[in-house]
């Protein structure tokens, strides 16, 4: 197997710096920052805190701790299925109502569902973790709900940014991942 570049022209510095030019577009920067913060809470914080909280409270071994993360997988898969399909349906329905392609901002209404699920999921996780004395699955049900909300927000906000600047879609993906990864690294320190 050989890795090579599809385009025969050599890499240039401009190609590496081009995603940084997206900082000039609020329609890319604002959703990226909003998504990165939610990602920091729903993915990074939960994966760091579950072992820290469950080990002393329930005396779990590494396998039992690892099984708690299945809730993130389940929530993410469900959130993607709901978020992607509903987002496309929502925009298609609006297209039929007004007889033309709706503005990309119309899609942002769906992110409220995701934000609500994140808050509800965190409330369930925190309250149930505090109240139970012997383990039951209710705290990780909250984690799954928050993960579903995270994925709905991901789908909605990234698709919105791409809808606003279709010609920059590849760079938007790089930009979102750069900001998200940077925020995910910084997040656990505060």
Where are these regions (language model features)?
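A single, central transmembrane helix in multi-pass transporters
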Residues: 30-40
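Short acidic/histidine-centered micro-motifs embedded in hydrophobic/aromatic stretches
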Residues: 25, 35-36, 175
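Generic, low-specificity signal for short hydrophobic/alpha-helical stretches with a mild N-terminal bias
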Residues: 2-5, 10-11, 15-18, 36, ...
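Hydrophobic alpha-helix/TM-entry signal in multi-pass membrane transporters
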Residues: 14, 27-32, 111, 139
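Central mid-sequence intracellular linker of multi-pass
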Residues: 1-26, 85-97, 103
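C-terminal transmembrane bundle
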Residues: 39-190
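Structural motif
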Residues: 26-27, 58
